[in-house]
Amino acid sequence: IRLKKDRFELDELARAVAVTKAGFDDIIRALPRAVGHRRGERVIEGAFRAVAREEGNGEGYETIAASGNHANTLHWIDNDGEVREGDLVLVDAGVEVDSLYTADITRTLPVNGRFTEVQARVYQAVLDACEAALARANQPGCRFKDVHDAAMGVIAARLHEWGILPVTPEESLASEGQQHRRWMPHGTSHHLGLDVHDCAKARSELYQGALLEPGMVFTIEPGLYFRADDMLIPEEYRGIGVRIEDDVVVNSDGSVTRISEDIPRTVADVEAWIARVQAG
């Protein structure tokens, strides 16, 4: 029953996403203060928590506010690091509304408002993976696991283009390969609802192997993670971690659309968003 949401549930999830957007706006307002604080990541976490508590029941899960190399720790929840000019900050956060339905959104923001060339290159690769996953979800006969496979096709191709992947994309994508998973080690999607990882214990044939059906709500969240101490990659990539996560719904006609479409995510739109919010 929980795998497919009814109208009430869909409305609550949309409300959770809308309040989460407000929380991200306050994160952007807090970025200058975060830069000057010895625990700037907690300034970001606190800004989001205030909105979650004031406008909802609270945070749907522990906020990840990961600046710089901390973004390369997938569930960085200590949030005790500095936030430095020129770095990216990866924020994975969601508001749980009073009905207990939660959003789950990730945005990777340039702390000073502008991406560097290499940051934008990595970011665009992740965004392209998001778009490929959404496009596959909109094709007839798509199974849940196909969404991940589509995203990984882009990730493997970009890693190969940059000279990072030690094999061809086809070899990496084969079950006996998977070399790309060094830099993208997690799944692309999970169901969303009362739990941030909704229906996590569902049988495989009802989850990964299931056809997408109207009422399903899930995330699309590929990433690329280049640790600062990774000697297998060019130096310019080291310390950069990017994830982009949206919440999507399968509509009654079978199309899949982003519930979180109002939260900017392209390079240009993110930069404009930061400038607009900080201008007041």
Residue ranges and their predicted role:
Residues 1-280:
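Active-site neighborhoods and metal-handling regions in enzymes and metal-associated proteins
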